[in-house]
Amino acid sequence: MLTLARQQQRQNIRWLLCLSVLMLLALLLSLCAGELWILPGDWFSPRGELFVWQIRLPRTLAVLLVGAALAISGAVMQALFENPLAEPGLLGVSNGAGVGLIAAVLLGQGQLPNWALGLCAIAGALIITLILLRFARRHLSTSRLLLAGVALGIICSALMTWAIYFSTSVDLRQLMYWMMGGFGGVDWRQSWLMLALIPVLLWICCQSRPMNMLALGEISARQLGLPLWFWRNVLVAATGWMVGVSVALAGAIGFIGLVIPHILRLCGLTDHRVLLPGCALAGASALLLADIVARLALAAAELPIGVVTATLGAPVFIWLLLKAGR
């Protein structure tokens, strides 16, 4: 038994090391890649200081943090709702953040500062997450809870479309592209949003014990002495914060929170002591690679990263649905 535990521990360490190496390689490639490729040897040249340190580095850090936040949010929501298909985009949390953002632009007539827009996006994400948690407490079946989340997402998407379609505001027209997901406008001015993600990410990665209890189910967690009300509300707040900040940084990006935790579980990373940091590393790597594809796919323009993640993630999602139905 002890030998099996040690083997599992070594395997977990190997997975985390491999994911760390993958993330570092993706980070280096992201700094090099672009319309003008700049190799590491030229990073400290005048051209490198402009393109790498002023343009690509803040974007790369934002992609890394958002990818980690979305993947961890997916893992947390799947444990919270006891639903393997739960994730921020599918359950409408990302769209809720978008509604909060667009409402702020409308009510503020485009005059609100960036920090206020970010807070409104966080508030929108929190509201949708709390509604979903209310549904979960009514002991809805997995399929009904999933449908409730999809319905909330459709309502939020419709509200955003109505607001954008009837608005004459240039800001809202630009938001229509932005809500498809993209890091094109990220620079060092958004560093406060990046910093707002770091403490919550680190804190959640350290909460493996309550997360493991929640993953056992509500009854088992209560029998083990976990204060469910406290942890549910704290994790809802943390998830809403991460999703809201991510939407404020890059718009709505789907499937990262769904696919990454599932793939890691299939690889044997079921313990949240390993799953949470693994999700952070794998989510960051996946979104970095998707961002590179979005930048390089077209010569004269940049694809919305949400399109890239949806194209890659939708087939995996269909496969997971088919597997769950067997």
UniProtKB/Swiss-Prot annotation:
InterPro entries xref list: ABC_BtuC-like, ABC_transptr_BtuC, ABC_transptr_permease_BtuC
Keyword terms, alphabetized: Cell inner membrane, Cell membrane, Membrane, Transmembrane, Transmembrane helix, Transport
UniProt GO molecular function: vitamin transmembrane transporter activity
Ranges annotated as spanning the membrane: 19-39, 61-81, 88-108, 112-132, 146-166, 184-204, 240-260, 274-294, 302-322
Biological process per Gene Ontology, one example term: cobalamin transport
Gene Ontology CC terms, in alphabetical order: plasma membrane
Membrane association type: Multi-pass membrane protein
Compartments, as annotated in UniProt: Cell inner membrane
Subunit-level organization: The complex is composed of two ATP-binding proteins (BtuD), two transmembrane proteins (BtuC) and a solute-binding protein (BtuF).
Its job: Part of the ABC transporter complex BtuCDF involved in vitamin B12 import. Involved in the translocation of the substrate across the membrane.
Family listed: Belongs to the binding-protein-dependent transport system permease family. FecCD subfamily.
Record-given protein name: Vitamin B12 import system permease protein BtuC
Organism: Escherichia coli O6:K15:H31 (strain 536 / UPEC)
